[in-house]
Amino acid sequence: MARRIAAGAAYGGGSVGLIGAATVGLVLAEVQLAKRLVGGGKAPVPPSADGRYGVAFAGPADPLRFVLLGDSTAAGQGVRRAGQTPGALLASGLAAVAERPVDFRNVALPGARSDDLERQVSLVLADPSGTPDLCAIMIGANDVTHRMPATQSVRCLSTAVRRLRTAGAEVVVGTCPDLGTIEPVYQPLRWLARRVSRQLAAAQTIGAVEQGGRTVSLGDLLGPEFEANPRELFGPDNYHPSAEGYATAAMAMLPTLCASLGLWPESDHLDGSRREGMLPVAKAASRAAREAGTEVTGARAPWALLKHRRRRRLPAHTEPVPHEDTGTDSGQGRMRGHGSGATWRRA
């Protein structure tokens, strides 16, 4: 399964399993404790960013349809304004690059693990307005903190990517973030949390790429920057990103989102000076888990392209235009409530 969870030996020798199950259990319990310590009680509902972006680009072409799936990071937990959420940042960035409106819908659920992707994908595919052009998935942190078996986690993600790709959507996965950056987690537990996160991220890369998706590594991108600037890049709960933190993640993912739709000016030409190359997918996944903002895209099996796309500054924070104000009926909705019983209303 996902090359035996990307063979933990790729991260400095030896699998996490060799360290001992008791130690792994201890670090994951410590992360759970850290979440309780920094969360400050029940987290507020993330602002809804559903709607249309780039209305100034309206023309004869239909708007691009973009959906974000995943957990609290995808939902934008920790910020107060819709325009600061990763979905809004990515949708406005897509609109600016494509010079075309983007209809955005977010089905992510705070607290979700990879086994919730089945429900989220079903919501996406049941939309009467049709299959989205592009889906992005940000998932994995809760799988680690709740000790979901990595094989199950990767299987759920792979199935989600396959269903979306079969339906005709492009898919980009932002892999598991670096849990070693949570401030109340101290050494040596911080080191082990980072190790487990990277191992899952590498396995997610293999699973997603083998199903026709692309991945962008978030762990090593956010890790050093969050560690160096925790007050700026973490939100008030010291667990979820701040607006600046979400912007950092969005800047890393936007080039790959655009490239998946043929919108990015760079081709898939490999630049050796940027440490790009064609590698076996397992090796590409291992490198991506260690290198900031690395994209991995499937090539001819068992090979994959490893790229470091140049980033652009994101547009200024943009609030969405509700769909009822655009004169269109997109069939999109906003989620209210938590858990599998969450309901939807028209946007």
Give the ranges of each region predicted by the language model:
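Conserved catalytic region of serine esterases and O-acyltransferases that act on ester linkages
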Residues: 2-33, 248-347
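Serine-esterase "nucleophile elbow" of acetyl-processing enzymes
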Residues: 29, 33-108
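Structural beta-sheet core signal
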Residues: 68, 137, 172-173
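Surface-exposed cleft-lining segments at the edges of enzyme active sites
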Residues: 76, 106-114, 141-151, 189-193
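Oxyanion-hole/transition-state-stabilizing segment in secreted/luminal serine hydrolases
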Residues: 115-154
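A short helix->loop->beta-strand "cap" motif at the edges of active sites that frequently abuts
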Residues: 167-169
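Substrate-gating cap/lid alpha-helix
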Residues: 182-217
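Short, conserved phosphate/pyrophosphate- and ester-handling motifs at nucleotide-, phospho-/glycolipid
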Residues: 242
